[in-house]
């Protein structure tokens, strides 16, 4: 892990961007059933497979890749985390056309015989599942807030529109059939935001927050979509 400190310094200084490569095409963030293969070859690991729906896939300077070093039957006990520079030979990316997330974007990362020194391993071999699960609840609350930002902007633009648009000699905002649904969504967006903040506050206090994180991850994206 000799190269981790310089990378950490760059990340803290805002000089580098890191992606988290966990999700795979066959399913969501199911860390216990990863298929991307990571095989030991002397002082190197060789990576083959695909990660998909990865935030900043084509913008990141480096990515933390979670892959299977154990057998498929080993489940959660055969996952290892590696720090992989995005300019490593054999690594390619593609970008999705994502509405609402253009500043960050998402995409796929493809690994074809990508060789990474053993020194790039984060933690112990086959122990990566524990590492990623520790960060899941924190990220779920943040994802909820990210989606709610889109919902909030959509509501603000809609309120502005109905106060300007005229119908039957009045602004649309004068009609309760128009404003009542918007008021309901305003209430729900604010409620979901507080759930996200509660989850983050509980984490800061060192308290259990898995339930709140799950609520945040479900409610925030749903409201943004609705």
Each model region followed by its residue ranges:
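N-terminal glycine-rich flavin-associated loop
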Residues: 1-2, 28-31, 44
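Internal helix-loop-helix
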Residues: 1-14, 55-62, 203
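Glycine-rich phosphate/pyrophosphate-binding beta-alpha loops
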Residues: 52-57, 100-102, 138-142
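Flexible, small-/acidic-enriched active-site or ligand-binding loops
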Residues: 33-35, 87-115
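A short core secondary-structure module
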Residues: 44, 48-94
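Alpha-helical interface subdomain recognition
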Residues: 10, 14, 40-45, 108-110, ...
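Active-site-adjacent elements of ketosynthase-type condensing enzymes
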Residues: 13, 26-35
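A short, Trp-centered hydrophobic/proline-enriched beta-strand micro-motif
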Residues: 14-22
């Amino acid at each position: 892990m000799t190269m981790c400190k310089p990378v950490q310094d760059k990340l803290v200084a805002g000089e580098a961007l890191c992606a988290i490569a966990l999700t795979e095409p066959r399913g969501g963030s199911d860390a216990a059933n990863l298929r991307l293969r990571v095989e030991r070859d002397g002082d190197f690991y060789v990576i083959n497979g695909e990660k998909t729906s990865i935030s900043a896939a084509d913008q990141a300077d480096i990515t933390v890749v979670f892959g299977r070093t154990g057998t498929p039957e080993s489940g959660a006990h055969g996952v290892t985390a590696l720090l992989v520079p995005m300019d490593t030979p054999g690594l390619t990316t593609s970008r999705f056309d994502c509405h609402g997330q253009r500043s960050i974007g998402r995409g796929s990362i493809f690994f074809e015989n990508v060789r990474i020194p053993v020194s790039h391993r984060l933690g112990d071999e086959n122990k990566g599942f524990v590492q990623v699960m520790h960060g899941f609840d924190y990220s779920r609350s943040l994802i909820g807030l990210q989606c709610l930002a889109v919902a909030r902007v959509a509501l603000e633009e809609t309120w502005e529109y109905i106060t300007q648009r005229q119908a039957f000699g009045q602004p649309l905002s004068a009609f309760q059939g128009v404003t009542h649904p918007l008021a309901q969504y305003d209430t729900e967006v604010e409620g979901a935001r507080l759930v996200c903040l509660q989850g983050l506050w509980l984490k800061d206090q060192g308290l259990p927050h898995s339930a709140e994180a799950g609520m945040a991850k479900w409610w925030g994206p749903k409201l943004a979509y609705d």
